Amino acid sequence: MRVGIPTEIKNNENRVAATPAGVHELVRRGHEVLVEAGAGLGSRVSDDDFRRAGALVVDGPDEVWRESELVLKVKEPIEAEYPRMRRDQVLFTYLHLAASRPCTDALLAAGTTSIAYETVQLDDRRLPLLSPMSEVAGRLSITVGAYHLMSAVGGRGTLLGGVPGTPKAKVVVIGGGTAGEHAAANALGMGADVTIVDLSLPRLAQLENRFQGAIQTRASSAYEIAAQLADADLVIGSVLIPGAKAPKLVTDEMVATMKPGSVLVDIAIDQGGCFEGSRPTTHDDPVFPVHRSVYYCVANMPGAVPETSTRALTNATLPYALALADRGWRAALAADPALARGLSTHDGRVTNAAVAAAFDLPAVPVESLLG
């Protein structure tokens, strides 16, 4: 199969969909890999690195998209890429379609078979292709939150861990999944006072055990979230409903009660955000004010640490990319229920129930396409 890897063109998206090691494995199995010139530079991977791995490096995105049967990307296509998508092509990438009607409509109009990393789901409900980037985003959320708490950039001037004789910053993590767990771990490591809020009592018990009582946990409710926000310095929103838009758990009314210069980081912004006032921002212009607080809503946080993120992403996605290339998408999905759950669109139809519900569209059962 001919596999294409275009350069990511979303703002400050420096990741690339495969490392030279991943390309080498595809080539070793008899596939032809086309890589757009410069695609790996943001991840410290040169064109020569890809050539040595066996890739054909081509100038510009048009040839990559035109000649490839399987396109591997990192982020969802943006408007400039819509005309390049086509019906006889498989797109394997993060999509977050429930938060983007334009991208959904473009995929349906093109008839592209799209498979979303973030909805590939194992029988135990784990999300193997989302988890590594959730780990990165969770850890980064504390790094960027701590930075924006500095008074020089508009924050309240609080050091997360304080120093002897001063109070620690209070960090509230809403959502105790992978991103929330890693945010809590990083905040705790920096000496902060950490509270995790989640709906699942069994998950809260797991987190208390994992952190050996060093964090506080609270059962989620609107009342509890409002109470926690009232004296929080840094709030991390890490709520996830696989494939669906994130629920708005933090209202503007709650934010109005927060300390001046407090910071809110919305990791869920890829899925529409879990704060009422959230809107996507970029690494170039990452924050905006809401009442007296600072919102950070960058939709591709792991793109800021591409050398780490690209390696972690390829480690997770490569086995599935190999299956798609080796067997073709129908056979690969028929053989692997986890991969089948990632199918989002095919031949102008939506196949993910959460995406269909978000836009009041009919959903075609994946099973009906694999028989």
Predicted region positions:
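Short glycine-/small-residue-rich Rossmann-like dinucleotide-binding loops
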Residues: 69, 75-76, 95-96, 221, ...
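Glycine-rich phosphate/diphosphate-binding loop of Rossmann-like nucleotide-binding domains
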Residues: 6-45, 154-237, 287
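Rossmann-like adenosine-cofactor binding region
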Residues: 209-292
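Adenosine-phosphate binding glycine-rich loop
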Residues: 118-159, 269, 274-371
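Hydrophobic beta-strand scaffold residues
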Residues: 33, 57, 91, 114-115, ...
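Glycine/serine-rich phosphate-binding loop and adjoining beta1-alpha1 elements at the start
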Residues: 2, 8, 77-169, 298-300
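An N-terminal-biased, well-structured beta-alpha scaffold segment characteristic
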Residues: 2-110
